[in-house]
């Protein structure tokens, strides 16, 4: 059994600004069933699905540096790379682990290990912080027969990520 005094946590309780509710929201974002969506009054177990919906974001795979350094004109970015030792940077990072990036409607940019598929980290841009409480929807049914609970999509990190290596001479 869980903490039955908190079993009825709701959106209004996270909006009251109590420190425990703010921590609960953070733990909810990390996958904890803080709002008891499965109805077992255990607010510490892991939700079955906690990645936000991916509607508009393309998946981006980033691995070893692959920017071109062959050029035909000194007005090309490749010219700058070729004349500033990009090839050393690229060879230094040739074994960089492949990572999958995708934006989701939970307000986060997610990074996944390409080989294992597990989440490595997620980033919440500062402009999304005020929107996070809007994820909680205690009236949304997720199964049949359903306990109440689910999440609303919050748009803001649902665009496609882009990749560009940042190469600065003297910094590896």
Feature names for model-found ranges:
Residues 1-172:
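A fold-level detector for beta-propeller and closely related beta-sheet-rich head/sensor domains
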């Amino acid at each position: 059994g869980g903490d039955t005094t908190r079993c009825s946590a709701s959106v209004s309780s996270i909006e009251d600004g109590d420190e425990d509710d703010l921590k609960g929201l953070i733990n909810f974002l990390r996958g904890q069933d803080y709002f008891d969506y499965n109805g077992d009054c255990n607010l510490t177990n892991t939700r079955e699905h906690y990645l936000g919906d991916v509607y508009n974001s393309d998946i981006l795979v980033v691995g070893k540096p692959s920017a071109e350094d062959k050029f035909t004109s000194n007005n090309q970015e490749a010219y700058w790379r070729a004349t500033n030792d990009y090839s050393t940077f690229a060879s230094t990072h040739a074994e960089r682990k492949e990572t999958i990036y995708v934006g989701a409607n939970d307000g986060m940019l997610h990074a996944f290990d390409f080989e294992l598929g597990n989440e490595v980290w997620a980033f919440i841009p500062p402009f999304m912080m005020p929107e996070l409480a809007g994820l909680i929807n205690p009236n949304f049914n997720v199964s049949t027969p359903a306990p109440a609970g689910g999440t609303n999509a919050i748009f803001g990190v649902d665009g496609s990520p882009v990749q560009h290596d940042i190469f600065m001479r003297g910094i590896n």
